[in-house]
C-alpha cells in the first residue's frame, strides 16, 4: 500500500520521516502529477488555513496564495481519477478550519463542495447554503458520489 506526503518544510519532513520511515515524500504539491502516483483508496489532505481563518486576513480560497493550494490537491485527484478511469482514489478527506464556512460569506466552502462534486459529476451545481449559512454538518448525495462534512 503506497504511503506518501507532499511537504516542503524541512522540520515537517523530518518528523514524518522519523515516525513513518517508509513514507515517500513527493515534494511541492504544485509539482506533483496525479497520473504518475500509484493508485490509493484514500487520499487525505489539508491546505494552509491562513487565508480562510477568522484569525487571518481572510484573503479567501481563490485570492489567498496559501489556502488556494486546495485546488492543487483537487487537480491531483482529477489526474489520479483520469489515469485510473475514475476508480481511484475511492475516498478523499479534506481538513481545514471552521473559518472556511464563513470565508467570502460562505462562497469559499461552497467552492470546496463544488470542487469535490465536480470530480464525479461536473453537471451538478452545489446550492447556496440553507438560510445563507452553512450547517456544521451536512451531506450532498448524487448518483455517483456522496459528500459529507462535519465540524
Model-assigned labels for residue ranges:
Residues 32-42, 52-151:
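Class I S-adenosyl-L-methionine
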